[in-house]
């Protein structure tokens, strides 16, 4: 049984396939699983089992996603593949499947297509940090020059959306050829795996990031002071450290004088743990749900930002009618709703249920935020959309 234990010690990296419909994303996913299982051990998966993606619900939104896993000698990968374009849009915006890197699949026979562009743009908006290109169906193109032309187009498209188009690895292969066991194409899958290992840096673990705890509840304990409770989102809070209380009101700083979990006193609270944090000299009314406790200076409160939004369809329990400029819903960040106004892109008059769109949001109260923060859009407690902070304006 020692082998199983060893596997868990490898760094864990989340990736996924993106790209235009029918360019071979699912075939490539199957090919990676099959070839790597053959070479490094692991479970092979066939096309049908990946394509038959189960439906999941993330914040009330129905998304079909396939999750597969594979290993290289250096790492363990969790890989997501979505059957339909709408699933990708929802997946990226809700962050249902966070990606440390994306594999952009482009058919050499077609070159970049509309969804190729849309997925690159979405990747930029939602913060996929690295993209590797797999040019697929190269066995169907005889002309070297055509392959070079497609590669150039893809690199230019990546650069247009602020990815380092000149430096992204581009692998030319045939997913179907590799799946059918043709040696020259299997080699290209190994080359892709090496690019994943070398080009996507090991992600920072939540525990190594600066401390953040979204406040869920506030209690006053006689003779001891004020306790806030919540789940530590990232980092570590230690007794005796300074912490900032950020969002909704003016930012204040105080000292953590105690951490407790299940009524036991601890020296520290770590990412993923539900804890109570005792705050020195803080009154019950100084703190409220929706604020965050954080390492001072690590995160700042903002009211205005651009975002990428997915609006739930009627079938998903969303609105039945479009909304227009001047729409004022609640934006649910972490643990609380804040009212905000929206500004639609130039030339867009209305937004229909089922659409995805970039918009600027202005909140009536500041919220601790960073680019990449996910939120829900609600009307009277009902979720009508999901979004992600793309860039902070003020």
Curated annotation (Swiss-Prot):
| One family name in Pfam for this protein | GTP_EFTU
This enzyme catalyses: GTP + H2O = GDP + phosphate + H(+)
Q: Where in the cell is it found?
A: Cytoplasm
Residue ranges for the region (G2) are 60-64
Name the domain of life.
Bacteria
- Where does this protein chiefly localize? cytoplasm
Positions of region (G4): 136-139
> Which amino acid positions bind Mg(2+), per UniProt?
26
Subunit structure, briefly? Monomer.
What this protein is called in its record is Elongation factor Tu 1
In its UniProt entry, the species of origin is given as: Photobacterium profundum (strain SS9)
Q: What is the lineage of its organism?
A: Bacteria, Pseudomonadati, Pseudomonadota, Gammaproteobacteria, Vibrionales
What is the primary gene name for this protein? tuf1
């Amino acid at each position: 049984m020692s082998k199983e234990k060893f596997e868990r010690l490898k760094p864990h990296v989340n990736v996924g396939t993106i790209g235009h419909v029918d360019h071979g994303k699912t075939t490539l996913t199957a090919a990676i699983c099959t070839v790597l299982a053959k070479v490094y051990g692991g479970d092979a998966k066939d096309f049908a089992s990946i394509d038959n993606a189960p439906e999941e619900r993330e914040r009330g939104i129905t998304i079909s996603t396939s999750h597969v896993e594979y290993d290289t000698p250096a790492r363990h990968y969790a890989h997501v593949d979505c059957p339909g374009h709408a699933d990708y849009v929802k997946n990226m915006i809700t962050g249902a499947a966070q990606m440390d890197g994306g594999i952009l699949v482009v058919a050499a026979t077609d070159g970049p297509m509309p969804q190729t562009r849309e997925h690159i743009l979405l990747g930029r908006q939602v913060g996929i940090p690295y993209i590797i290109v797999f040019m697929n169906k190269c066995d169907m193109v005889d002309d070297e020059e055509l392959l070079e032309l497609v590669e150039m187009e893809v690199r230019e498209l990546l650069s247009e959306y602020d990815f380092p188009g000149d430096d992204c690895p581009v692998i030319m292969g045939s997913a179907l050829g590799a799946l059918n066991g043709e040696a020259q194409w299997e080699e290209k899958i190994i080359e892709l795996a090496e690019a994943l290992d070398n080009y996507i840096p090991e992600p920072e673990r939540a525990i190594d990031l600066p401390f953040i705890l979204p406040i869920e509840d506030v209690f006053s304990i006689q003779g001891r002071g004020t306790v806030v409770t919540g789940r530590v989102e990232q980092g570590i809070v230690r007794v005796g450290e300074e912490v900032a209380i950020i969002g909704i009101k003016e930012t204040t700083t105080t000292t953590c004088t105690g951490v407790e979990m299940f009524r036991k006193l601890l020296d520290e609270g770590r990412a993923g743990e539900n804890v109570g944090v005792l705050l020195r000299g803080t009154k019950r009314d100084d703190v409220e749900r929706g604020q965050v406790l954080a390492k001072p200076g690590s995160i700042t409160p903002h009211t205005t930002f651009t975002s990428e939004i997915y609006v739930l369809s009627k079938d998903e329990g969303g609105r039945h009618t479009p909304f227009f400029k001047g729409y004022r819903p609640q934006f649910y960040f972490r643990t609380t709703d804040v009212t905000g106004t929206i500004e639609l892109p130039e030339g867009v008059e209305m937004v229909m249920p089922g659409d995805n769109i970039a918009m600027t949001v202005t909140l009536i109260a500041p919220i601790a935020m960073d680019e990449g923060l996910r939120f829900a859009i609600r009307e009277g407690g009902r979720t009508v959309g999901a979004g992600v902070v793309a860039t902070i304006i003020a």
